[in-house]
Every structure is written in C-alpha cells, then in structure tokens.
Swiss-Prot record:
This is Thioredoxin 2. It comes from Nostoc sp. (strain PCC 7120 / SAG 25.82 / UTEX 2576). Participates in various redox reactions through the reversible oxidation of its active center dithiol to a disulfide and catalyzes dithiol-disulfide exchange reactions. One of its GO terms (molecular function) is protein-disulfide reductase activity. InterPro entries: Thioredoxin, Thioredoxin-like_sf, Thioredoxin_CS, Thioredoxin_domain.
Length: 111
C-alpha cells in the first residue's frame, strides 16, 4: 500500500474510495478552516501508521459539493470511514490523537 494522504476530487471519489479494496478514511477539510490545520498532522499520522490496512484521502469541501452532500458533511474537519458504499463510522470537529487512533482501531482491528 502507498503511504501518505491522497488528495481527491468528486470525480475521483468512486475510483479512489468506493472501489478501494481496504477501508478508506475520508478527511473533509477547507483551506479557510483553522481547526483543519490542527487535524492535518493527525491525518498524516493515521496514513502512515495504518498504511498496511487503510487508505487515507482528503477532499476539500468547497470545490467538491457532490461528495460533501452525499456524505452529509455539515462541518469541518470531518471524517468518514468508508468500505465500499458503507459508512463504517463518522465524526466531525477536531479530535485528539488518542481519539483518532481509537476511532480507527475499533474498525480496523475487527477486519
């Protein structure tokens, strides 16, 4: 698996997320969002820590309204853990490193 966070758009969502073999953490963010700047290092950490069993992508909300609407993102930063068409879990707002790792471990250790 590749390490690191992949930047995607509405047009790439199906191929990068819905057709991925492993679960995908989708990080919804905005360039104007201060709290998103706090979350970015944690998203990178998750991508590197779980690279063997998780794909991590980020999607900027303003230029990608279709996916934002489909996944009912009401605020940023927001996370959706997706496997195929199924949302395994979601959260909105800044979360701590421990909460992020627990959020991921809950699902990835059961797969």
């Amino acid at each position: 698996m590749s390490k690191g966070v992949i930047t995607i758009t509405d047009a790439e969502f199906e191929s990068e997320v819905l057709k991925a073999e492993q679960p995908v953490l989708v990080y919804f963010w905005a360039s104007w969002c201060g709290p998103c700047q706090l979350m970015s290092p944690l998203i990178n950490l998750a991508a590197n820590t779980y690279s063997d069993r998780l794909k991590v992508v980020k999607l900027e909300i303003d230029p990608n309204p279709t996916t934002v609407k489909k996944y009912k993102v009401e605020g940023v930063p927001a996370l959706r853990l997706v496997k195929g068409e199924q949302i395994l879990d979601s959260t909105e707002g800044v979360i701590s490193k421990d909460k992020l790792l627990s959020f991921l471990d809950t699902h990835l250790n059961n797969n």
